[in-house]
Curated annotation (Swiss-Prot):
<dbReference type="InterPro" id="IPR035464">
    <property type="entry name" value="SIS_AgaS"/>
</dbReference>
<dbReference type="InterPro" id="IPR001347">
    <property type="entry name" value="SIS_dom"/>
</dbReference>
<protein>
    <recommendedName>
        <fullName>D-galactosamine-6-phosphate deaminase AgaS</fullName>
        <ecNumber>3.5.99.-</ecNumber>
    </recommendedName>
</protein>
<dbReference type="Pfam" id="PF01380">
    <property type="entry name" value="SIS"/>
</dbReference>
<dbReference type="InterPro" id="IPR035466">
    <property type="entry name" value="GlmS/AgaS_SIS"/>
</dbReference>
<feature type="domain" description="SIS 2">
    <location>
        <begin position="215"/>
        <end position="364"/>
    </location>
</feature>
<dbReference type="InterPro" id="IPR050303">
    <property type="entry name" value="GatZ_KbaZ_carbometab"/>
</dbReference>
<dbReference type="GO" id="GO:1901135">
    <property type="term" value="P:carbohydrate derivative metabolic process"/>
</dbReference>
<dbReference type="InterPro" id="IPR046348">
    <property type="entry name" value="SIS_dom_sf"/>
</dbReference>
<dbReference type="GO" id="GO:0009401">
    <property type="term" value="P:phosphoenolpyruvate-dependent sugar phosphotransferase system"/>
</dbReference>
<keyword id="KW-0378">Hydrolase</keyword>
<keyword id="KW-0119">Carbohydrate metabolism</keyword>
<comment type="similarity">
    <text>Belongs to the SIS family. AgaS subfamily.</text>
</comment>
<dbReference type="GO" id="GO:0097367">
    <property type="term" value="F:carbohydrate derivative binding"/>
</dbReference>
<dbReference type="GO" id="GO:0016853">
    <property type="term" value="F:isomerase activity"/>
</dbReference>
<comment type="function">
    <text>Catalyzes the isomerization-deamination of galactosamine 6-phosphate to form tagatofuranose 6-phosphate and ammonium ion.</text>
</comment>
<keyword id="KW-0677">Repeat</keyword>
Amino acid sequence: MPENYTPAAAATGTWTEEEIRHQPRAWIRSLTNIDALRSALNNFLEPLLRKENLRIILTGAGTSAFIGDIIAPWLASHTGKNFSAVPTTDLVTNPMDYLNPAHPLLLISFGRSGNSPESVAAVELANQFVPECYHLPITCNEAGALYQNAINSDNAFALLMPAETHDRGFAMTSSITTMMASCLAVFAPETINSQTFRDVADRCQAILTTLGDFSEGVFGYAPWKRIVYLGSGGLQGAARESALKVLELTAGKLAAFYDSPTGFRHGPKSLVDDETLVVVFVSSHPYTRQYDLDLLAELRRDNQAMRVIAIAAESSDIVAAGPHIILPPSRHFIDVEQAFCFLMYAQTFALMQSLHMGNTPDTPSASGTVNRVVQGVIIHPWQA
């Protein structure tokens, strides 16, 4: 490497860095567009949401699937509707387990490219299995199959994200968060909309501004060999996505794991050693937060990990007893909003860890065996 090489300098000019940095602007652009589409969206959705026994499945592959993991629990509790998260990779292999012909279905398909074989096949299988099936694809690619098929369908409403969210880098960054914010705004507009979400955008922008040129490293630099992200409820989905970002951008050179704080005790905690970094996403809900802090204190008492870092909206004696990050000041955030803040740190950590290990984050898979749009999938026709 040249003598003046630094990870921060290498990040400059990558698509991945640009796509991380433009997220707050992209969210407001998309939610403003949803404001303009509200009447048309309501015309499509309101008759469906009145149907008894309507199932709403949030689906996608990889990172796109984790959107459902993050937001489905809150959407279900907030709206009282039957939201669930099922990856396309499960719908395609086991449609008989998830698609019930007796219940009307709204399939919300997330996709950056909209061309993943499983995503296209999941739509076809849903139509094949469920007589009363409707579709709301939320995608970043106007030319993708998900979008194009939907605009030519009578049972679908296609929602297109701003063009800049069709990430050119290998890993999904602005695409996941913009699709996530947009789905929340569609189904919970009284809570998530282009005005209220400015608080989230501003807080995340403050995080990115505080991180500067990323030269310091989000969690510092140390010779760790493993990272574990922990989060409760929907934040476990954010932890899962955070772990995947590290695996993708380091091409597996840094092993990454995720769990819930309570689940981590039941075996997975065995992986913690003196080369392990643990990051705890602390819930903003006062009840859930107790469990997060219990595990945080326990991990620090164990003194097995190289470092245990808490990221929280507010400090406490337990949080402050070890390495921690306090989110920039703002109003109280519910966890589904706070997830966006946690992902800013996780995406930036993955980018800088990739560069620190000598990878090229826009194309981290030197072998070419892992692709931006998955390849090698054979879709087998369903035969009842």
